[in-house]
Design a protein with these regions (language model features):
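Beta1/beta-strand and adjacent pyrophosphate-binding region of the FAD-binding site
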Residues: 2-13
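Core beta-strand elements of the Rossmann-like FAD/NAD(P) dinucleotide-binding domain
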Residues: 3-5, 216-225
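N-terminal Rossmann-fold NAD(P) dinucleotide-binding loop
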Residues: 16
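C-terminal accessory subdomains/tails of enzymes that are appended
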Residues: 36, 82, 97-104, 114-118, ...
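Glycine-rich active-site loop/strand segments that organize a redox cofactor
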Residues: 39-66
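A conserved short coil-to-beta-strand element within the FAD-binding core of flavoproteins
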Residues: 194-208
Length: 526
């Protein structure tokens, strides 16, 4: 019996979509089922950084940090529209302390007990030297020192912070990263099925028979192999749906963020160290806002929607107020979001200490292979996919070689420093666009922005204006090409325009999308 596909991937987050893209590009037939919107769970709720993970050096996770540092620049070249370099300012004060549970702090307590848990400047310099050199940096500038008493980055900070270090990492639009991987997988032959839940799986004559539920419709497809990339639900799928006896576990860790009005008058980020040894970031966000996070809290149930608790919000506010000249309060918070990280359960004593590295395990006990993905960072998703394919390849004939390094995602076929030129060209071809609107479109769609606007001579040609520069032309593109079905998909995942739209505008958008979907379905049925 010929199966419907080689791989059935469960989960449409960054790991599932990354594996789907890689596998489809190697000639495998791929189906991917995601029970909700593409990239709507963990992958939509990160701190939105492509970074090596400076703090992971304290846990001696050198392999993870090196791999992530190398990947920063590989990914930057492949998606310069949704990812870009940023400089991070790390203020230092003699009161800085280690998290006393880290391997580094335990070692120093033995060899240098007089330090009493302090995090000295020389040790930060050493860590940043490693950070600059572990990954063979080629594009990003290296570490420098700042005098906060005279540098603009010192304005807005408590004057007790006089010195700082500055290093490089990258921003990424996480939700768009997932969608673009799904689109590219589909362009290479994969079948992407959002809002389709896997409700059962059994092995018959060496093939997986997987039951899918979409709305009130149920069907079964067959596959040679199942890939369990269900994120927070990976354990449930492994032992429930796939009926595996594997003891591999997942630790659910909730990370919460707050968004305030813009706190600083420059475009650099801050890496703030707490007196408890933890760190948070303060990052320029959507031009007019500042993103602050994250927390690390154990989360008991993947089916319980993650939401910031009052204690987490107070923690983030108190933490950043230790650095600000002008404190903020709950009244300054305009939005919050939380996500659950499905970390491999390595028995760590705290959520912060749990490894961020990925673990991939294959089980053949049911009579057909199933691969499960635990953990991972958004920065290493492409390497995770390559590693998964290394484990998958011997189950199939004629699997092509690795190929994804540096291959652009949709809209990313332009130089890393080419955004300004694209914005200029877009404004020339569509003169009704403002500077800010054109930049938003380029940052979202890259070279495809012109394709989306093709034929428009005036603003009216873009159709209904929903507010915040969102028009019917763009929404139609998102529905036709990017799997969007609801207003929430559009304003909180494909974009962050929900920060600039009120409830009435979002309701109007939802009504329009419902009508448009009905009209499209009726036309397709004729």
């Amino acid at each position: 019996m010929k199966p419907d596909c080689d791989l059935l991937i469960i989960g449409g987050g960054i790991n599932g979509c990354g594996i789907a893209r890689d596998a489809a590009g190697r000639g495998l037939s791929v189906c991917l089922a995601e029970m909700n919107d593409i990239g709507s769970a963990t992958s939509a709720s990160s701190t939105k950084l492509f970074h090596g993970g400076l703090r992971y050096l304290e846990y001696f996770e050198l392999r993870l940090v090196r791999e992530a540092l190398i990947e920063r620049e590989v990914l930057l070249r492949a998606m310069p529209h949704i990812s870009w370099p940023m400089r991070f300012v790390l203020p230092h004060h003699r009161s800085m302390r280690f998290d006393m549970t880290t391997p580094t702090s335990r070692l120093l307590n033995v060899v240098m007990p007089w330090m009493r848990g302090r995090r000295p400047a020389w040790l930060i310099r050493l860590g940043l030297f490693l950070y600059d050199n572990l990954g063979g940096r080629k594009i990003l500038p290296g570490t420098s020192r700042l005098d906060l008493r005279s540098a603009p980055e010192g304005r807005g900070l408590n004057p007790k912070f006089e010195k700082a270090f500055e290093y490089s990492d990258c921003w990424v639009e996480d939700s768009r990263l997932v969608v673009l991987n799904a689109r590219d997988a589909e362009a290479r032959g994969a079948r992407i099925m959002p809002r389709t839940k896997v409700t059962g799986a059994e092995v018959v004559d060496g093939l997986w028979h997987v039951t899918l539920q979409e709305g009130d419709q149920s069907r079964t497809i067959t596959a040679k192999m199942v890939v369990n990339a269900a994120g927070p639900w990976v354990g449930d799928v492994l032992r429930g749906t796939l009926k595996s006896n594997s003891q591999s576990g997942v630790r659910l860790v909730r990370g919460s963020h707050i968004v305030t009005k813009r706190l600083f008058d420059h475009d650099k980020c801050y890496f703030f160290q707490g007196t408890d040894g933890r760190i948070i970031f303060a990052i320029p966000y959507e031009t007019d806002f500042t993103l602050i996070g994250t927390t690390d809290m154990d989360h008991t149930d993947a089916d319980v929607k993650p939401q910031i608790t009052p204690e987490e919000q107070s923690y983030l506010i108190d933490f950043i107020n230790g650095y600000l000249a002008k404190p903020i309060s709950d009244a300054d918070v305009v939005w919050t979001y939380s996500g659950v990280r499905p970390l491999y359960d390595d028995g760590a004593s705290s959520a912060s200490a749990a490894t961020r590295d990925y673990v991939i395990k294959t089980d053949t006990s049911r009579g057909a292979p199933a691969l499960s993905v635990f953990g991972g960072k958004i920065t290493t998703y492409r390497r995770l996919a390559e590693t998964a394919l290394e484990q998958i390849a011997h189950h199939f004939d004629g699997v092509d070689k690795v190929w994804t390094a540096g291959v652009p995602l949709p809209g990313g076929d332009f130089p890393v420093d080419g955004v300004d030129a694209l914005v200029t060209g877009l404004k020339r071809d569509f003169p009704f666009l403002t500077d800010r609107w054109a930049l938003r479109l380029v940052r979202a769609y890259g070279t495809e922005a012109a394709q989306m606007l093709d034929g428009a001579k005036t603003l009216a040609d873009l159709g209904t204006d929903f507010g915040a520069t969102l028009t019917a032309r763009e929404v139609t593109w998102l529905m036709d090409k990017e799997y969007a079905r609801t207003a929430q998909d559009v304003v909180w995942r494909r974009s962050k325009l929900g920060l600039r739209m009120d409830a009435a505008e979002i309701d109007r958008l939802q009504g329009w999308m419902k009508d448009h979907a009905q009209q499209s379905n009726a036309a397709a049925a004729e």
